[in-house]
Amino acid sequence: MQGLTLVGSVWLGIGLALPLLVLVVNPLLVYLVARRVPWRPIPVVTTFPSVSMIVAVHNGAALMETKLDNALALDYPPAQLEIIVAADGCSDATEEFVARYGDRNVRLLRLDEHRGKTWALNTAVAEAHGELLVFSDADALLPAESLRQLVAPFADSTVGGVCGQRVIGERHGALREAQACYIDLDSRLKHWESRLGTLTSNDGKLYAIRRALFVPLPPAVTDDLFLALAVVRQGRGFVFAPQARALIPTPSRGAGHELERRRRIVAASLHGIRLQKVLLDPRRYGFFAWRLLINKVFRRLLPLALLLVMGGTLLLLPGHSWAWPLLLLQLLGYGLAFSHLLWPKIGIQPPPLLGKVSATGFYVALGVYGTLLGVGDFLRGRQPEKWTPRKTDGV
């Protein structure tokens, strides 16, 4: 019995300490350190470097007209902006839509075979002429000033890359609200990290790097995180420009899509970190190495922490009365999360607050399960399936 108590105590301690480190200690420490760093205002743009905006797309005909009209309406000198659309083995009318813009600084790269996003981006970069490479998704619409805001930090020669701010354009529905809440919290961490000069994450909806710092993307990585880390590895900063906004629809199209999306992102991002594991060496990269380890590796282990908490609680039930309330609290949390699926089946409309808590819990549970599957894929060396995005509800 003493042995089980010891094991249960260790499991419970680790299971509680890991979320505390990731969700409380790390953000608080980043915030406190960032406050001691003098704020550097973003330089005023007086010159406009040449920009190549790259959009990789697979069967995105429903999006291209809106996307290209939006890109061409950006407040940026047309002579300094080229738009490259890499059509990754499209079988719909994507190429026909893009071809109509051929006389307006829009270049179409026809990639006959569907080989995935990394191949499309590598091919497009090889054709790009801009000093800066801007990457933007087909479903991301930019306010007129966004490109100027994204480019402005490059006036500082120590900056090698800039991350934009994603904004969910419509927030109707509990799942959308939950995802928007997560994005808002993540953006706060980016803001504090940016004061330290380097982010530990990036956003594929809108970001930019210097073309001279581009590293060809290997298979099965997330392009945004891999390129951000490549910039840091080359000794440049990667910062956040919150005014460079990208308006997007809800990232998840439903529970199944969110699960698949989270699984793929986790496996691919861990693979990308493994390929650049030198960044985890604090002797060379100092505080950044610890932040990367906590925010991008330990965060992926949170599902295991929840399993340890449950397992530790069960082992401590005999002879420890305080373990029973802890078990009930966990069961209540899981019950609230999965009640989100139950309400429609039994025809009950829950009170607004209960419905919101239930939907948020369900979104968190989906993310936890998808993360667990992604970690499993990474440990088994299972490559994520080929990039086949769902950018509209009908695609």
Give the role of each language-model region:
Residues 49-52, 82, 226:
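Cell-envelope/extracellular polymer assembly enzymes that use nucleotide-activated donors
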Residues 70, 87-96, 113, 140:
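A conserved acidic beta->alpha catalytic loop
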Residues 80-85, 95-127, 173, 177, ...:
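Conserved donor nucleotide-binding strand/loop of the catalytic core
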Residues 133:
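Short aromatic/hydrophobic "clamp" motif used to bind/position activated sugar donors
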Residues 154-185, 219, 223-295, 366-369, ...:
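Catalytic donor/gating beta->alpha subdomain of glycosyltransferases that bind UDP-sugars
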Residues 69-80:
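Short, acidic, metal-binding catalytic loop of nucleotide-sugar glycosyltransferases
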Residues 33-34, 119-120, 144-221, 363:
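Long helical/loop segments within the catalytic core of UDP-sugar-dependent glycosyltransferases
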